[in-house]
Amino acid sequence: DVAIFNRQPSLHRMSMMVHEVRVMQGHTFRFNLAVCTPYNADFDGDEMNLHVIQSEEARAEAKILMRVQEHILTPRYGGAVIGGIHDHISGAYLLSRPGTLISVEHGLEMLGNIGWTGSLPEVVKDQNGRDSFRGQDIISLIIPDNIHLRFRSRSNDDVVVKNGSVEGILDKRAIGAEDGRLLDAIVQTNGPEQGA
C-alpha cells in the first residue's frame, strides 16, 4: 500500500510525497534519510502527517504524480533535491577510495541488498590472501553504462565516470542532496526509477 507523507508547512510540492508503507515495530513513522531535505526534516521533534488514501483510483493517481522517485529533481533549480546524506556519503567515500577492498561475503551481501542480478566484479586477493572485491568495482556495477561525467569532488579530487566505471573518490558532490552531480546525471539520463 501507499500513503501520503507530509510535513507542514507545505511550502512546495515535495512537502507531500507518496511513500510505500511497510509495517515495522514501534510507534513512530520512519522514512529513508535521503528524503529529509525536501521535507526539511531535522529530527528535532518534527511533526509529520500520514494521509491514508481511500480509493483505488486515488492510490493509482498518487503513485503516478506524487511518488518520491518522481521528485528527485526539484523544479526550483533542476538539480537533485533527494540524495545521500550522512551515512550514504560516508559509505560512498569509503567504498570509492583507491585500495579499498571488501570481502566477497560482504560484497555479495551489499549487492544482494539492492537486488543485484548482473555479473560480479573481478575477484582480487587482499593482503591476507582472502578473496575480495575492489570498492570502486562494486560502485561501478550499479552506475548505468551510459553515464559519462567529469567533476571535482569537494576534496578537490578529479572524479571521472566513463561508461559507468568510476575513478576518483565520491563524496557529497557526487551523490549528496542538492549537490549530487552523479545522481543528477543518472536521473536526467535514465529517469527517476534508475536514480532511486
What positions do the PLM features span?
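Extended, highly charged
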Residues: 1-17
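Feature marking long nucleic-acid-engaging regions of large polymerase/nuclease enzymes
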Residues: 19-196
